[in-house]
Amino acid sequence: MASQGTKRSYEQMETGGERQNATEIRASVGRMVGGIGRFYVQMCTELKLNDHEGRLIQNSITIERMVLSAFDERRNKYLEEHPSAGKDPKKTGGPIYRRKDGKWMRELILHDKEEIMRIWRQANNGEDATAGLTHMMIWHSNLNDTTYQRTRALVRAGMDPRMCSLMQGSTLPRRSGAAGAAVKGVGTMVMELIRMIKRGINDRNFWRGENGRRTRIAYERMCNILKGKFQTAAQRAMMDQVRESRNPGNAEIEDLIFLTRSALILRGSVAHKSCLPACVYGLAVASGYDFEKEGYSLVGIDPFKLLQNSQIFSLIRPKENPAHKSQLVWMACHSAAFEDLRVLNFIRGTKVIPRGQLATRGVQIASNENMETIDSSTLELRSRYWAIRTRSGGNTSQQRASAGQISVQPTFSVQRNLPFERATIMAAFTGNTEGRTSDMRTEIIRMMENARSEDVSFQGRGVFELSDEKATNPIVPSFDMSNEGSYFFGDNAEEFDS
């Protein structure tokens, strides 16, 4: 693994920059979100959205999706070459909601992709600003992570649905770059690899010829990304085995599934970033805030402060609970779908409840839903405290690879002990330790068994008052250990179908 010196921070990945100091990073991240904000303001002008309509999260999502679609070169090329009836490859659009005579009306709009690309570049000093595009992809991914379960996808890959906490970023597009790779969970990477190996098993030519060479490079790159997420030598050595396999097949799939299970205790490093909807940045820009001058960070207090004074709305279906809709969006904004609910309760200052008990469906409204009965309400996205986002999975004693917890991938660097029964997890490891990876498997199982409960606690800082911008006085919350802290436990959330 690269030593700390060569590791780029998320913000550098996000902004495609070389090594920068903290001030430069804050400025370039500020430039990125400022560009998103300027673009949003301009789009509202183009579409003649009034202030209230511009603050509607559904309109924000449509506008974000339009610009992402305009810049999706591979798909654009595919659409040009495979024209489908009634679809103009040069246009993009979606539903825009307007307030007419006290009701919300849906209007389907179409815009030239060229025109949207022009507006985006203009808002970003004439550049393509890929970092800003990736940022919006991560926001959509975080929203999906909070809204949907991926049990079906897990089962298809031969994995256990209880591993859903490892699935962060599972809906991110391939083109999301280094910043996207950083936020993908261990389960997500494993699933991508298993899909690839399965294709290789079924299709003899998958690894052959010029295309096969490119496939092989992609396979090894994905293996390296996954290896970099593991923090113990044995897990990494197993990844080397998987990567170097001449002809990846069922043995590799077995190894990968074993590694995924091990990540429930020996947690991987997965980055967390607070990516907000474009309309939030737009509001700040419209009020004259200069992100680049002030600087911005995705992992500190800034997103909390921004949400503290942004009033945005959401459409609400008749049987939905507005407070529950707010919780869903709040969790998505902070990339907290897999965080311990007790930590979220404390930070948000209001009760955060598991997905299965939320009376709300996804944020987006399907085109066949009846608008007559749809109302809107303010999203409550404020918090009581703030905390620093983690990228390590919270294992500070790296060299001893402290253990993690089942069903939670911490988002916030907040100290807590972890609610899980080691016995439950260890039960998943009975059986197969033979084969080429036997010594590594044995070593991993030994580490998991020996994880003492203090190793299993999450070493972190505390939370901070919103007035404490420099994070000088950590408050270490004490948690009631009696209840399980997982959002998706005992759940009936809808499945994500792409």
Swiss-Prot record:
Phylogenetic placement of the source organism: Viruses, Riboviria, Orthornavirae, Negarnaviricota, Polyploviricotina
Major localisation: virion
Record protein name field: Nucleoprotein
Family named by the database record: Belongs to the influenza viruses nucleoprotein family.
Keywords from the named record: Capsid protein, Helical capsid protein, Host nucleus, Host-virus interaction, Ribonucleoprotein, RNA-binding, Viral nucleoprotein, Viral penetration into host nucleus, Virion, Virus entry into host cell
InterPro entries membership: Flu_NP (IPR002141)
Subunit structure and binding partners: Homomultimerizes to form the nucleocapsid. May bind host exportin-1/XPO1. Binds to viral genomic RNA. Protein-RNA contacts are mediated by a combination of electrostatic interactions between positively charged residues and the phosphate backbone and planar interactions between aromatic side chains and bases.
A Pfam family it matches: Flu_NP
An MF annotation (GO) of this entry: structural molecule activity
Short sequence motif named Bipartite nuclear localization signal, residue ranges: 198-216
PTM (free text): Late in virus-infected cells, may be cleaved from a 56-kDa protein to a 53-kDa protein by a cellular caspase. This cleavage might be a marker for the onset of apoptosis in infected cells or have a specific function in virus host interaction.
Domain of life of the native organism: Viruses
UniProt-annotated stretches for the region Disordered: 1-21
Cellular component annotations (GO), alphabetically ordered: helical viral capsid; host cell; host cell nucleus; ribonucleoprotein complex; viral nucleocapsid
Keyword Lipid biosynthesis carried by entry: no
Placement of sequence motif Unconventional nuclear localization signal: 1-18
Compartments where found: Virion; Host nucleus
Its biological purpose: Encapsidates the negative strand viral RNA, protecting it from nucleases. The encapsidated genomic RNA is termed the ribonucleoprotein (RNP) and serves as template for transcription and replication. The RNP needs to be localized in the host nucleus to start an infectious cycle, but is too large to diffuse through the nuclear pore complex. NP comprises at least 2 nuclear localization signals that are responsible for the active RNP import into the nucleus through cellular importin alpha/beta pathway.
Alphabetical GO biological process terms: symbiont entry into host cell; viral penetration into host nucleus
Residue ranges of the TM segments: none
